[in-house]
């Protein structure tokens, strides 16, 4: 009987440890404030060069001309996953060459050229998206 209680306790401790590890990994994965400045908004305009429509997060890559130097910089724009965006976005919503205007929360490190998307507009097009994907 004592052995059964010890085994039950050991299983409980292992299960609890796994649960704590797994939930910590989920929170770390979705820690947008660690990567983005949540109370600021930045807007970029440029040419969309790549659209990765996938889970768990989609990405739009945009070439943006630096206003001071004139040099082009590739920006990575994080978006919701394909399943979260279903119904409002699909693989044909954006195509390379589209001129886009994107607003969102800027990355903490300006040299990373990152934004967490809050809105997207295809300039001279008919596609507009606004929302949240938490």
What label would you give each PLM region?
Residues 86-102:
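Short nucleic-acid-contacting surface segments enriched for D/E, G, S/T with interspersed K/R
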Residues 3, 11-25:
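Bacterial N-terminal signal peptides
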Residues 74-90:
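Beta-strand/loop nucleic-acid-binding surfaces
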Residues 27-42:
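Short boundary/loop segments of OB/S1/cold-shock single-stranded nucleic-acid-binding domains
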Residues 54-65:
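Short aromatic-glycine-enriched beta-strand elements
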Residues 107-133:
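OB-fold/S1-family single-stranded nucleic acid-binding modules
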Residues 43, 70-74:
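Short, mixed charged/polar active-site loops
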Residues 44-48:
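Conserved hydrophobic positions within beta-strands
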């Amino acid at each position: 009987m004592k052995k059964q209680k010890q085994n039950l306790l050991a299983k409980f401790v292992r299960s609890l440890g796994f649960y704590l590890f797994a939930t910590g990994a989920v929170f770390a994965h979705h820690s947008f404030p660690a990567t983005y400045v949540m109370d600021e908004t930045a807007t970029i305009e440029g040419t969309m060069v790549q659209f990765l429509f996938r889970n768990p997060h989609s990405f739009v890559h945009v070439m943006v001309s630096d206003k001071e130097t004139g040099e082009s910089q590739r920006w990575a724009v994080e978006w919701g996953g394909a399943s979260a965006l279903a119904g409002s976005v699909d693989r044909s919503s954006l195509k390379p060459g589209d001129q886009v205007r994107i607003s969102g929360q800027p990355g903490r490190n300006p040299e990373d050229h990152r934004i967490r998307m809050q809105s997207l507009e295809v300039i001279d097009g008919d596609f507009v998206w606004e929302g949240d994907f938490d």
